[in-house]
Structure formats: C-alpha cells, structure tokens
Amino acid sequence: MKILLYFDWTGTRKELKEHDKKMQKACIDTGVEHEGLFGSMNEKWNYVWLFQANGFDHFLEMSRKVPRPIHMTHYITELLIPIRL
C-alpha cells in the first residue's frame, strides 16, 4: 500500500531535513519503505512524504516512533490501495 502524508511546515529547511532523517530511521526500524519527500503542487500543502507499507497498521507502527514536531502545523494521510483488475 502506498501512503501519502501531506503536511505544512513552518520550520527551517534544516529542521525539515533533521525530521526527515528521523522518519527514515523509523522506516528502517519497522520495514516501511521511505520513498521520498516531495514538494506538493497541491496549493493546500507544502510537502508530501511517500511511503510503502504492508498496511495502515504497519505505517502507524512506524509513525508512532517519531513524535510530530511543532513545525508540522497540520497534515493528512492518504492511502492508495492497489486494485486488481
């Protein structure tokens, strides 16, 4: 399952880079694939992380290892579920 985590960031680029490293470590620890941090063309959000997880519970296991920083003012999670035709 692909998981998109859209969020706004009020901190510096350095702080974002440090937080991304924490996310990458949590991914390694739990086996979730960190597929990158991207700038979002969606005018609502500043950034989006892309993850590959076995399921939403697997993703939650990873995300609970990294507390949400104060610079992440709000976020949404979008799940992309594979469809077999």
Give the positions of each predicted feature.
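Short S/T/G/P-rich N-terminal loop/turn motif that feeds into the first structured element of a domain
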Residues: M1-V48, Q52-R64, Y75-L85
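Catalytic alpha/beta core of large soluble enzyme barrels
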Residues: I70-T73
